[in-house]
A protein has these predicted regions:
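N-terminal secretory signal peptides that target proteins for export/translocation
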Residues: 1-9
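An extracytoplasmic/periplasmic, membrane-proximal ligand-sensing/linker region
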Residues: 32-39, 43-54, 227, 231-292
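Short helices/loops that flank or line small-molecule/ion binding pockets
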Residues: 76-90, 103-104, 135-138, 179-200
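Pocket-lining segment of extracytoplasmic ligand-binding domains
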Residues: 130, 140-239
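Extracytoplasmic small-molecule ligand-binding "clamshell" domains
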Residues: 32-96
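Short coil/turn segments
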Residues: 42-45, 116, 126-131, 145-152
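C-terminal segment of classical bacterial N-terminal signal peptides
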Residues: 13, 21-30
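Hydrophobic/proline-rich hinge and linker segments of small-molecule sensing/allosteric domains
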Residues: 110-133, 230-233
Length: 292
């Protein structure tokens, strides 16, 4: 009788163990099934979250899994999140991609960029009547965006240097607003004499009448360069990388869904990109002493 009870007890424990393992494995599988997306915080958190909503829904449909948007506190956090595979897909600026590529030892892959990113530009703005060209910035105060921003810091700094202006020596003071919209606000409020930012954010503010162009105006637009992209870690299976790439390339303004996503992403369409496209940005960063 005791042997029978012992056998039953052993079988019951085995069943409970298997059940517990099954629950645990299911929990892990569910966690792994969540596809995580992040983006550099180049605009306000509420604006970034708003822009992400229809794209997240679209990716859920394409991938067949739950997709979550994961906000980050700064540009460096977005780099670390992808390099450490805490997220699956990241929206980077060109410089942020270069930083992630170096930080990961070449283990990140840019998939697509907006057509606009093949010929992106930065813009310098001011509310001062005394500033009409770059040389007029000498002795003035200037706001960049984030230190890791391509269009809000690296490339504006690079073009200033090319014009014979060293921001650290020739300007009265430089500031970092943290985001493009914050740069506009700093110029409009008179906190700084001028600001450098992403041209698409400036154009959106002008179109939406969020800035008084009778007071704040653009006075210099940079030459073009490659900028933003959607990037993944090389550990992502090739089949999933292709699925993501095809999903972005398939977005069209001819469908309601595509039109909404593209409008929020400020894109006419997405095109394939590659690491080699960002060599000039890497060189500019090295020349400006911004690569660590």
């Amino acid at each position: 009788m005791l042997g029978f009870i012992s056998t039953v007890r052993s079988r019951l424990l085995a069943c409970l163990t298997i059940a517990a393992l099954s629950v645990g494995l299911n929990t892990v599988a569910q966690a792994q099934a969540v596809f995580k997306v992040t983006a550099i915080p180049d605009e306000s958190p509420t604006e970034l979250a708003r822009k992400a909503v229809p794209l997240i829904k679209y990716l859920e449909k394409v991938l067949g899994v739950k997709v979550e948007y994961i906000p980050v506190s700064d540009y460096a956090a977005s780099v670390e999140a992808l390099v450490n595979q805490q997220v699956d897909l990241a929206w980077f600026g060109g410089f942020t991609f270069v930083q992630a590529n170096i930080r990961s030892g070449g283990k990140v892959i840019p998939l697509v960029q907006r057509e606009e990113d093949t010929k992106f530009q930065s813009i310098f703005i001011t509310a001062s009547a005394d500033i009409k060209e770059l040389k007029d910035l000498k002795g003035k105060t200037l706001s960049f965006g984030s230190p890791s921003s391509t269009s809000g810091h690296l490339m504006p700094r690079s073009f200033l240097l090319a014009a014979g202006i060293n921001p650290d020596n020739d300007l009265k003071r430089i500031a970092f607003s943290g985001a493009h919209d914050a740069t506009i606000a700093a110029v409009a409020s008179g906190k700084v004499d001028a600001g450098a930012l992403n041209i698409s954010v400036w154009e959106k503010f002008v179109a939406d009448k969020k800035v008084d162009t009778t007071k704040v105006r653009a006075f210099y637009t940079t030459p073009t360069y490659f900028d933003y992209n959607w990037t993944v870690h090389s550990a992502m299976p090739e089949a999933r990388r292709k699925l993501l790439t095809d999903a972005f390339l398939a977005l069209s303004p001819d469908t309601p869904e595509g039109k909404e996503i593209l409008a929020l992403q400020r894109a006419t369409k997405f095109v394939p990109t590659k690491t080699e496209n960002y060599k000039d940005i890497e060189a500019a960063a090295a020349n400006a002493g911004l690569l660590k």
